[in-house]
Amino acid sequence: MKICKACSSCMVRTYVDGNIIFRCSCGESVQGDSQNLLVSSKVYHTGEMEDKYKIFIKNAPFDPTNCQIKKDCPNCHLDYLTQICIGSQKIIILVCRCGYMSNRG
């Protein structure tokens, strides 16, 4: 991530002809360097993602910063569920304090 020197906004990383370019909404652009390379990446499938984020999912209903939606829990009938979004594919998972979980959003 880079910060624009002209307006102090976050710049967005893009790729042009195999080169990393950071662009700002104000029009500024900066050439990326070797420090900005992604060494490795992995896209997790839903089952792997649930294993990777098991503790995060378990604790999500107790974190007041997570989004709560008005939907009854089919397990304990609490009148809301906690909605979290995980992974690069932005998978939506609904969880409840009782342990209920649904990845159907």
From Swiss-Prot:
Subcellular location as annotated = Virion
Q: Name one GO cellular component term.
A: virion component
Where is this chain primarily localised?
A: virion
Q: Which UniProt keywords apply?
A: Virion
The family this protein is said to belong to: Belongs to the asfivirus C122R family.
Protein name, entry field: Uncharacterized protein C122R
Source organism per UniProt? African swine fever virus (strain Badajoz 1971 Vero-adapted)
